[in-house]
Regions:
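Elongated alpha-helical scaffolds that mediate protein-protein interactions in large eukaryotic proteins
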Residues: 13, 22-180, 186-196, 203-220, ...
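Extended HEAT/HEAT-like alpha-solenoid repeat tracts in very large eukaryotic scaffold/adaptor proteins
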Residues: 45-52, 95-103, 150-160, 197, ...
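Extended acidic/polar regulatory tracts at the flanks of large eukaryotic scaffold/adaptor proteins
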Residues: 253, 284-290, 300-358, 363, ...
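Long C-terminal extensions of eukaryotic subunits of large macromolecular complexes
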Residues: 2-5, 9, 14, 28, ...
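Acidic, Ser/Thr- and Gly/Pro-rich intrinsically disordered linkers and low-complexity segments
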Residues: 32, 82-91, 134-151, 322-352, ...
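Positions within ordered alpha-helical repeat solenoids
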Residues: 55-58, 83-87, 101, 105-108, ...
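N-terminal "cap/leader" segments of large eukaryotic alpha-helical scaffolds
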Residues: 2-83, 320-347, 487, 494, ...
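Long terminal accessory regions outside catalytic cores
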Residues: 266, 270-280
Length: 527
């Protein structure tokens, strides 16, 4: 080959290093005298301070979040301001909206600030504000009010409460908001209410805050949103809420009672919808996550086993295949974030990885236990009337096997990369990930190793490591043996002991411990 042509081809194959991400813009200072106004002698001074803070940059609020939260709690002004919101059907004032926006922004800065606001009186005041706005909307619907309860008022109150609650059902109970007003907000066609209202409803359902009448209303809502194109995408989040509500309210109930009929109708709707939602093409990320969450709830318990193996194995093939694909995508996304990719939504993407990967790996672990006949949740009293699981169809077993092996291969590769990133950070190398990214990687190693440990414990080396013939070359035991020191470090870290320093090299080394592991060795991979 011509040397010049060869040089050009080689140059084309050289991977170019992507340009570094531009540094974040410096935080803008708070408006002059904003903090001084919060310490003012009158409420008029504090209102002026809130209005200035509401117009401030988010980064500047984050830099002074603890100080602002302490000032607001010391004067109790924010709680007094919000408790009067929406009285007698009146609209929110500009000061009340500013208070809601500032509280929401402060709660999103850190868990410590959110805890400080939630432990104070701001949480109850925000809950009272949501209820007042809901009452004002009811009055406006009856024609008793013409200005209160607007969509803007409702959106501001719901977003603030969602930020203060932070997904904790106990905080939602403390706020005084139950399922009835949240269901009313979810019925509204306005899209600006939907994200916060659904998030709060999910939290309420997970905490058992919906009574049987509300469960029946949610069932009706979840079945009717499909009929309209503008609400078609709302089905998956509502199905997830319904699955959580039924699971939280599971318990003894007379077969002929209204409660039993409501729960059975809700379960039937959820179990029919989940496979269809998982197969839905072009679904948005939030809809896929909601469908996976509902699938995880449905797969639990004795009833979950019967549901998974139903329809001649069609359900379990869909659930296992989607869980394996989403687990691989989430693990790859976490590695990409550790490598420095991403933009303004890095934190959102990291939060999704931390939520989706363990969820999907847990679903696959449940499927694997059912395949192995190791069902640990088959004696639940609330599933006493659950149908017996049918015998799994052979093609369903093969589909589950392929899905579990695909996820195991992704988990093995992820744990190996996480070990290399951990070693790079320990040596202070320039390519080491940021501390937050490394913490995410190590956190995701635990559910990954839990699945791998179960698979390694149940399969012998011929089944798991066959790379010839019709095998897939997973090499499970050999690759886990290479990760054994890394696993020991994770176990030591979980137990509070300082892990030993990483080895001097990360590649193949003749001086490294032997990777041969006897089958009788007891290795804790997180199971």
């Amino acid at each position: 080959m011509d040397p010049d042509k060869r040089a050009k081809l080689v140059a084309m194959e050289v991977e170019e290093t992507p340009p570094p991400q531009p540094p974040p813009p410096p935080a803008k200072p708070l408006p002059p005298r904003a903090l001084a106004f919060l310490d003012g002698p009158t409420d008029e001074h504090r209102v002026a301070g809130l209005l200035l803070l509401a117009a401030a940059d988010a980064s500047s609020l984050q830099a002074h979040a603890s100080e602002i939260a302490a000032k607001l709690e010391a004067s109790n002004f924010l709680a007094r301001l919000l408790k009067t919101a929406g009285d007698d059907g009146a609209a929110l004032t500009s000061a009340q909206r500013a208070g809601l926006e500032v509280a929401r922004a402060l709660a999103g800065t850190s868990d410590d600030v959110r805890d400080a606001l939630a432990k104070g009186s701001a949480l109850e005041a925000c809950g009272a504000c949501v209820l007042s706005v809901a009452d004002a909307r009811t009055m406006a619907a009856r024609g008793d009010s013409i200005e209160g309860g607007s969509n803007e008022d409702a959106a501001a109150a719901l977003r603030c409460l969602d930020a203060l609650v932070g997904g904790d059902p106990r905080r939602l109970v403390t706020s005084g908001v139950d399922g009835a007003p949240l269901l009313a907000f979810c019925r509204d066609a306005d899209e600006q209410l939907w994200p916060a209202a659904t998030s709060l409803l999910r939290c309420c359902c997970a905490g058992g805050g919906l009574d049987d009448e509300s469960v029946r209303a949610l069932t009706l809502l979840a079945t009717t949103v499909r009929s309209k194109s503008e609400t078609y995408a709302r089905e998956a989040p509502l199905i997830e809420c319904l699955a959580l509500a039924v699971a939280a309210r599971a318990g003894a109930a007379r077969t002929s009672s209204t409660a039993a009929h409501a729960r059975k109708a809700a379960r039937d709707v959820v179990e029919e919808a989940v496979p269809r939602l998982l197969r839905r093409g072009g679904a948005r990320e939030v809809c896929r996550d909601a469908a996976l969450g509902a699938a995880a709830v449905c797969a639990s318990g004795r009833r979950g086993a019967a549901w998974l193996w139903g329809r001649d194995g069609a359900v379990v093939r869909v659930v296992a295949g989607c869980a394996a694909a989403e687990a691989r995508l989430a693990l790859d996304e976490a590695l990409a974030l550790a490598a420095g990719s991403g933009g303004d939504d890095r934190q959102r993407r990291a939060d999704r990885c931390a939520r989706v990967a363990p969820l999907c790996l847990g679903v696959l672990e449940r499927v694997l236990r059912l395949l192995l006949g190791d069902d640990e949740s088959g004696d639940e009293s609330d599933d006493s009337e659950a149908p017996d699981a049918p015998a799994p169809a052979p093609d369903a077993v093969l589909g589950c096997r392929d899905a579990v092996r695909d996820a195991a291969d992704a988990a093995l590769g992820f744990c190996g990369e996480a070990r290399l990133q951990r070693d790079a950070a320990a040596r202070g190398l320039p390519e080491a990930p940021a501390p937050a990214a490394l913490e995410l990687l190590l956190a995701l190693c635990r559910p990954s190793l839990s699945l791998l440990g179960l698979l390694a414990a149940e399969l012998d080396e011929d089944e798991a490591d066959d790379g010839d013939g019709d095998g897939d070359g997973l090499a499970l035991h050999a690759r886990l043996a290479e990760l054994r020191p890394f696993v020991d470090d994770l176990v030591a870290a979980d137990r509070g002991a300082a892990p030993p320093p990483p080895p001097a090299t990360t590649g193949d080394d003749d001086s490294a411990p032997s990777s041969e592991v006897d089958s009788d060795d007891e290795i804790d991979y997180g199971t």
